[in-house]
């Protein structure tokens, strides 16, 4: 009986450990987060380790103005594309929220700095 109980506890520990691994992480972004940008990119890509169901993406610009951004796909995927972010000169925070495949809420922030345009006199 003691072996049975120990076996069940070991199996439970394995199941809990596997469940914890169901949360996903960002593997890379394009452009790279914290990269200085000459201008706003046409899209921003977020590559996750596992598929996520993105629920919202907003940008907070240097003036602290927040606006919703569109993204694709609307279904669960490991690669999320943010369409036409129209980043403003200065610091921009892309704040995203989604659901991992185990149903837990995940979120993060990407920082991009867009150079100020120089006007020619």
Role assignments for model-derived ranges:
Residues 1-8:
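Bacterial N-terminal signal peptides that target proteins for export
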Residues 11-12:
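Repetitive helical segments and hydrophobic/amphipathic motifs
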């Amino acid at each position: 009986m003691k072996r049975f109980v120990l076996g069940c506890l070991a199996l439970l520990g394995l199941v809990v450990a596997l469940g914890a691994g169901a949360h996903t992480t960002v593997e890379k972004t394009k452009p790279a987060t914290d990269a200085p940008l000459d201008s706003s990119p046409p899209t921003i890509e977020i590559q996750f380790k596992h598929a996520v169901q993105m629920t919202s993406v907003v940008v907070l610009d240097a003036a602290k103005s927040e606006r919703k951004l569109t993204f694709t796909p609307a279904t669960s995927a490991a690669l999320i594309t943010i369409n036409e972010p129209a980043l403003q000169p200065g610091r921009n925070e892309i704040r995203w929220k989604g659901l991992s495949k185990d149903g837990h809420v995940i979120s993060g922030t990407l920082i991009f700095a867009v150079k100020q345009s120089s006007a020619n006199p």
